[in-house]
């Protein structure tokens, strides 16, 4: 259960940072 959340977070966080900082 926890690893699935961690994998999803690791996938989503870069996208959020990308959209906030506009640095992809």
UniProtKB/Swiss-Prot annotation:
This is Brevinin-1Ea. One of its GO terms (cellular component) is extracellular region. Belongs to the frog skin active peptide (FSAP) family. Brevinin subfamily. One of its GO terms (biological process) is killing of cells of another organism. Disulfide bonds join 18-24. It holds the Pfam family Antimicrobial_1. Expressed by the skin glands. Keywords: Amphibian defense peptide, Antibiotic, Antimicrobial, Cytolysis, Disulfide bond, Hemolysis, Secreted. InterPro entries: Antimicrobial_frog_1 (IPR012520). Transmembrane segments: none annotated. It comes from Pelophylax lessonae (Pool frog). It is found in: Secreted. Shows antibacterial activity against representative Gram-negative and Gram-positive bacterial species, and a very high hemolytic activity.
């Amino acid at each position: 259960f926890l690893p699935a959340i961690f994998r999803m977070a690791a996938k989503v966080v870069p996208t959020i940072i990308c959209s906030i900082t506009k640095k992809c």
